[in-house]
A protein has these predicted regions:
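Intrinsically disordered, low-complexity terminal regions
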Residues: 1-109, 113-128, 132-170
């Protein structure tokens, strides 16, 4: 009996550790995503019943059940110290406090908007379909593409090397 209790306690610890493993890739549809630098990984969803949250292929996605009307409809607070990828549709990104990362990819579509303060070695940004993004901070390399009446404001971003800054008219 003692061995079974120890086994179950160990199994519970392993499952809890795996569940709290920090996620580094995010997708949002219809949400305001607020990223806050923190050594402790934590996520708070304003009203979890409004949407679905799913982890698949190392991407944590937040998708509203009702995609009609004005967006965003709910807010997600993400406390983390490491982000690799943020993808958004009909959403808003808020990261006013600086994040220090090696590489970051941000993709905005369908009228998404936001502000990102970052210190990165490599920063890839893609904005499409009327999206607006303000970048602050610094990066060694910036790879930026805009399409379909979108804009990326880099006035407050110090860039050492701009590998691509292209605008495609569609």
């Amino acid at each position: 009996m003692k061995k079974v209790a120890l086994f179950l306690a160990g199994l519970g610890f392993c499952l809890m550790s795996q569940a709290e493993e920090p996620v580094k890739n995010f997708y949002f549809a219809g949400y305001k995503a607020v990223f806050i630098p923190s050594d402790t990984f934590r996520i708070e969803v304003g009203n979890p019943d409004l949407g679905t949250q799913k982890l698949k292929d190392e991407i944590l996605s937040f998708t509203l059940k009702d995609a009609s009307g004005k967006m965003p409809k709910d807010v997600v607070y993400i406390y983390t110290n490491d982000i690799h990828r943020i993808s958004m549709s009909y959403s808003e990104l808020i990261a006013d406090q600086s994040f220090s990362v090696d590489s970051l990819s941000i993709s905005l579509a369908a009228g998404s908007m936001g502000t990102m303060n970052v210190k990165a070695k490599y920063l890839h940004v893609s904005a499409g379909a009327g999206s607006q993004l303000i970048l602050k901070g610094e990066t060694d390399v910036l790879d930026c593409t805009t399409k379909g009446n979108s804009s990326v404001n880099t006035n407050e971003l110090k860039v050492r090397k701009n590998v691509r800054n292209s605008k495609t008219v569609e």
